Amino acid sequence: MRTIVIMVTFMFCINVIINSQNVMKHELVKLPYAADALNPVISKQTIEFHHGKHLQGYVNNLNNLIQGTKFESANLELIVKESDGAIFNNAGQILNHNLYFLQFSPSGGGKPSGRLAQAIDAGWGSFENFQKEFEAGGMGVFGSGWVWLASDNAGKLSIVREGPAGNPVTKGLKPLLTFDVWEHAYYLDFQNRRADHLNSLWKIVDWKIVESRYNN
């Protein structure tokens, strides 16, 4: 009898291990730059709170929420496309922030080149016109949200405004560039000056990253 109990316990433990390996555990994205590298556009303090606290909280929440659901082994983009409620909100925030933080570089700035530059010129006439429209899109988000540069399957670009956790993937579009207009993204550095926050972000955009998203 004791042998049977031991064997049952052993098999249960094996199943737990196997099942746990099949569950996708989402992790906090690692930044490719130091916390103070984007200063003064984004301060070290903002990075530490925005990335280390806010984003970590979304990651923790999502990992807890998807346990026992059909999303527990799904990738982030699929979760955002197919979920709703709390799961969507946390997954959307993770996907958005991952794209946001990874598009920056302390040596960023300048202008895009190649196919992306051509597509921007085709859509807005010039890069400068695009910048103005993009910043206006960010200013037009009421409350918390995001402004995106996105492309369709044909490569045509559009500026998309989204709410708190919204992402263009839910519209069948490819997200290329995003500016976060949640207050926690800029209040420590710019207080209520959202326009200054938006305008300053161009200085740290890594266009090689944005171009790679467009070309892939």
State where each predicted segment sits.
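Feature for soluble, non-membrane regions of globular proteins
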Residues: 21-216
